[in-house]
Amino acid sequence: MPFGNTHNKFKLNYKPQEEYPDLSKHNNHMAKVLTPDLYNKLRDKETPSGFTLDDVIQTGVDNPGHPFIMTVGCVAGDEESYTVFKDLFDPIIQDRHGGYKPTDKHKTDLNHENLKGGDDLDPNYVLSSRVRTGRSIKGYTLPPHCSRGERRAVEKLSVEALNSLTGEFKGKYYPLKSMTEQEQQQLIDDHFLFDKPVSPLLLASGMARDWPDARGIWHNDNKSFLVWVNEEDHLRVISMEKGGNMKEVFRRFCVGLQKIEEIFKKAGHPFMWNEHLGYVLTCPSNLGTGLRGGVHVKLANLSKHPKFEEILTRLRLQKRGTGGVDTAAVGAVFDISNADRLGSSEVEQVQLVVDGVKLMVEMEKKLEKGQSIDDMIPAQK
C-alpha cells in the first residue's frame, strides 16, 4: 500500500542492499530491469505527490508473474512517475512495446472515417465487438496513489461531465455502493462491469483501497457506450454491441470519447497526454492509445490448427479466453484483439483487428470444408 513519505525517509536508514527486493523467482518486465544499482539510484526519489520507487514496483514484487504471460510488474502513481522514474520505466516500455524508444513520438487518430471496412464481419462467427480505452484526468494522482477525497472529486467531475451528454449518449450513472450484490454480479456476467477487486495486481498496487467508495459505471440508455469510473484508471471508456459491426462500434467510440474530452477541457481538466507516451495511464502496458479493440469470435477449427498461435502473432493480434484475461475459451469462442498500444494510432490498431479477424473467419470456413489454409497464412505485419 502507498505510505507517506516519512516512511520512505525512514527506509533510507537501511543500506540499499538491505532494502532491495528478492526478485530471484520473478518473470515480469520490472524484475528484468531493476538491478541493485538502479534501485540504489532511484530509491530516495519521489514525485511531487510523494509516490516512491517502492510504490511503483510493489505490485511486481508481490506478483512474481505468470509462467507464460509476461506481466509488467509496476504502476505509475501520477503523471510525473514516468519522468521521475524514467530510468526504470523507459526500458520497460521499450521491452513491452516492441522496441519503442525514449525519443519516439506517438500518434493519435480518432477520426473514425479513416477506418476501412469493418461493417462486414460475419455475425455467424463474430458474436460481439468492443473497443475500449482509458483516460486520466490532469491534476489528480492515479488510482494506486489517490486519496479518498481525490477519488471522490474525480467521480464528481466525471459524473457531471457524463450526465451532460445528449442524443445517443444520454445516460445515467450507477454508483457501486448503491447496487445490490445481484445487480453487480449481473452487470459483471454481462461483461458491462469490472470485476470485484480480487486481482492480486489491483490489490498489491493499492488500487482497491476504500472499495467500493467513489467507483461506478455510467452507461447510455441502450448500454452500447459505457464508462467505468475509478477502477484501474480514472476513466475506462467502452463502446460495444452484439454482432460484427466494428465500424459502428468504432464510430460511437470516437465520437463519444471526443465529446467527453471536450467537456473535461472546458472544465479546465484535460486528459493526461504527451507526444512521447500518448495518453498517460496507470499501467505502462496501456500507454499510447490505451485502446483494445476486440471481438468475440467462434473459431472451432482454426483454434486447433498447429499454426493458430503463429497466425495471431503475424497479424499482431492476441487472444484471451471468453471472459477476458486468465479465462478459458468457452465453446471455442475467443476474445481476439490488437496486441499494440504505443507507436501506432487508434485507427491503425482497429484496422489490424478488422482485417485480421476477417482473414481468420475465411480460414475457419475453409477448414470447415476440410480444405487446407497453408496458402492463406499471412506474412508478418
UniProtKB/Swiss-Prot annotation:
One GO MF term: ATP binding
List of residues that carry Phosphoserine: S164, S178, S199, S372
Enzyme class: transferase
Sequence positions that bind ATP: 128-132, 191, 236, 292, 320-325, 335
Catalyzed chemical reaction(s): creatine + ATP = N-phosphocreatine + ADP + H(+)
Lineage: superkingdom: Eukaryota
Family affiliation: Belongs to the ATP:guanido phosphotransferase family.
Function: Reversibly catalyzes the transfer of phosphate between ATP and various phosphogens (e.g. creatine phosphate). Creatine kinase isoenzymes play a central role in energy transduction in tissues with large, fluctuating energy demands, such as skeletal muscle, heart, brain and spermatozoa.
Protein's UniProt name: Creatine kinase M-type
Organism: Mus musculus (Mouse)
Native organism taxonomy: Eukaryota, Metazoa, Chordata, Craniata, Vertebrata
